[in-house]
């Protein structure tokens, strides 16, 4: 290609499985990218997501964030975005794809790859600030901050392996309708933004600044891996993994700012494939692949079997019709009996900011409540309320009036 590389596929590996040479190449590449002040440097690429805003076009008087959330093209926009960073890192010397941080498995510690403040390079007897530990936000003279919620990140499920993220992604992967999958998938992905950013403004938890934290690309490499896993499951289920059955017009609409071209997007590959429908064939178009497409050690066959096992009992879900509220938010909900006794039933997060593109899902986000109802001796036909509380990223209470009351959905086996 025009960068002097042959088109061999880069492999995206777990951050915990990188060889010393791979880790060194990534650290030096990101350090170099962060020092690159061109239109293809770190600050420019970070601005693709939200701030300084480039949409609807850079010369517009009133601009908003280009990143896609709350819409069917969320997976495709972020696939392009990881490619944008991956190609930039390769130009700066990386020999491996963007590694992924697998947060579906119970975490015992935070990976040193991004948690160590100092990078010690034993080969060259050098040490310097680890570029994956943070970054400057040049346009407003701030630095990325983290307020990591280790309680949620390290929390095992009742059986150990069945973490919050595992259960959320399993239900997303169960969906054979693309748009049903997308809603579940996107909300599941939001959790890591909230758990890494916490109550910090200049962080993963805020739509405007998330992409300035290098953890963003590690998280989105994993998010994209789970999207690729869904594609493999679709193939296994007899569907075309490169086709969707909904939002067809959106799939033909080029995604910004990738479609802009120079002087904003200098990457010819993401410009050429800026239509969402052109992102499905990621190996052919973007030349990367994953070391493992699995969830908690389950390959596609075993995952398919596990998903079918979940369907062998009657299930009850709480259904939420979500829309953007101009900020990131944490939602908790409880099941309340008619005598007033309430039991905590679940939680999820929304990623947002004042510059977000207005959005509203056209279908429900579903959260399973079968076990909570059983523990309280409730049947789906009994009378109970679902009570929501909503707080902003900085722990301010938010009115829940924006959302219609949750639905109760019964799914027989």
Swiss-Prot record:
Asked whether the UniProt record includes Glycoprotein among its keywords, one would answer yes
Disulfide cross-links:
55-66, 179-246, 336-342
Q: Where is this cross-link: 2'-(S-cysteinyl)-histidine (Cys-His)?
A: 67-69
Cell compartments where the protein resides: Secreted, Extracellular space
Task: Tell me, in a sentence or two, what this protein's role is.
Answer: Hemocyanins are copper-containing oxygen carriers occurring freely dissolved in the hemolymph of many mollusks and arthropods.
Give binding positions for Cu cation A. Answer: 49, 69, 78
Which cofactors are named for this entry?
Cu(2+)
Print the keywords alphabetically: Copper, Disulfide bond, Glycoprotein, Metal-binding, Oxygen transport, Secreted, Thioether bond, Transport
This chain belongs to which protein, by name?
Answer: Hemocyanin type 2 unit e
What's a Pfam family in this record?
A: Tyrosinase
Top-rank lineage group of the source organism = Eukaryota
The family note in this entry says: Belongs to the tyrosinase family. Hemocyanin subfamily.
Name the positions where Cu cation B binds.
Answer: 189, 193, 220
State the species of origin.
Answer: Rapana venosa (Veined rapa whelk)
Major site of localization recorded for this protein: secreted
Q: Which GO terms describe its molecular function?
A: metal ion binding; oxidoreductase activity; oxygen carrier activity
């Amino acid at each position: 290609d025009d960068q002097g590389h042959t088109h061999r596929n880069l492999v995206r590996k777990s951050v915990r499985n990188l060889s010393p040479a791979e880790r060194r190449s990534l650290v030096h590449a990101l350090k170099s990218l962060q020092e690159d002040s061109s239109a293809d440097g770190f600050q420019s690429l970070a601005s693709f997501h939200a701030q300084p805003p480039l949409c609807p076009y850079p010369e517009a008087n009133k601009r908003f964030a280009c990143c896609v959330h709350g819409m069917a093209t969320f997976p495709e926009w972020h696939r392009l975005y990881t490619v944008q960073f991956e190609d930039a890192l390769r130009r700066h010397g990386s020999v491996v794809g963007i590694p992924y941080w697998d947060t579906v498995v119970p975490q015992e510690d935070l990976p040193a790859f991004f948690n160590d403040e100092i990078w010690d390079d034993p080969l060259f007897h050098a040490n310097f600030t680890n570029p994956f530990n943070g970054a400057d936000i040049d346009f407003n003279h701030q630095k990325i901050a983290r307020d990591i919620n280790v309680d949620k990140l390290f929390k095992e499920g009742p059986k150990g392996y069945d973490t919050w993220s595992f259960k959320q992604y399993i239900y997303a992967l169960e969906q054979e309708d693309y748009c049903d999958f997308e809603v579940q998938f996107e909300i599941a992905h939001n959790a890591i933004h909230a758990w890494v950013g916490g109550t910090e403004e200049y962080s993963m938890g805020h739509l405007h600044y998330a992409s300035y934290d290098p953890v963003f690309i590690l998280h989105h490499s994993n998010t994209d891996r789970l999207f690729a896993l869904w594609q493999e499951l679709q193939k296994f289920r007899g569907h075309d993994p490169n086709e969707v059955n909904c939002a067809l017009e959106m799939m033909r609409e080029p995604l910004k700012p990738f479609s802009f071209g120079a002087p904003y997007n200098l990457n010819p590959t993401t410009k050429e494939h800026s239509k969402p429908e052109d992102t499905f064939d990621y190996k052919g178009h973007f030349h990367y692949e994953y070391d493992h497409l699995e969830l908690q050690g389950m390959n596609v066959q075993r995952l398919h079997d596990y998903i079918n096992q979940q369907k062998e009992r009657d299930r009850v879900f709480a259904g939420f019709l979500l829309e953007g509220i101009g900020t990131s938010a944490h939602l908790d909900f409880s099941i309340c009996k008619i005598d007033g006794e309430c039991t905590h039933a679940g939680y999820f997060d929304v990623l947002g900011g004042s510059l977000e593109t207005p959005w509203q899902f056209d279908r429900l986000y579903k959260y399973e409540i079968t076990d909570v109802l059983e523990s309280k001796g409730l049947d789906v036909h009994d009378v109970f309320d679902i009570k929501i509380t909503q707080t902003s990223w900085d722990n301010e209470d938010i009115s829940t009036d924006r959302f219609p009351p949750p639905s109760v959905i019964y799914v027989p086996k």
